[in-house]
């Protein structure tokens, strides 16, 4: 198996773990809401969940830069990948 494929599988596993943690955090928020937890507790859990999701997004953006922009076969492909990334980041930030 080429190194790039092995790296992709490793990255996929890392992203799956991140998503599992996010799912657990969302479920914890749901349970807290069902048990009438305080607003402070809910906000604490929500910000932790948002931080985990931000980390997931950062990983995916990093992978996109490495796989599509840096490894582009030519300037046109790199430009297209960069434009796609700009749109994604813009929609994320606004």
Q: Which residues are covered by each model-predicted region?
A:
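Solvent-exposed interaction patches of small proteins and small membrane subunits
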Residues: 1-94
């Amino acid at each position: 198996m080429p190194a790039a494929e092995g790296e992709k599988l490793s990255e996929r596993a890392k992203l799956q773990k991140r998503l599992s943690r996010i799912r657990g955090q969302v479920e914890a928020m749901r349970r807290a809401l069902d048990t009438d937890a305080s607003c402070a507790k809910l906000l604490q859990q929500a910000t932790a969940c948002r931080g985990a999701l931000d980390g997931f997004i950062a990983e995916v953006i990093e992978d996109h830069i490495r796989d599509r922009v840096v490894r582009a076969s030519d300037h046109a492909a790199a430009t297209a990948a960069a434009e796609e990334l700009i749109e994604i980041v813009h929609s994320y930030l606004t």
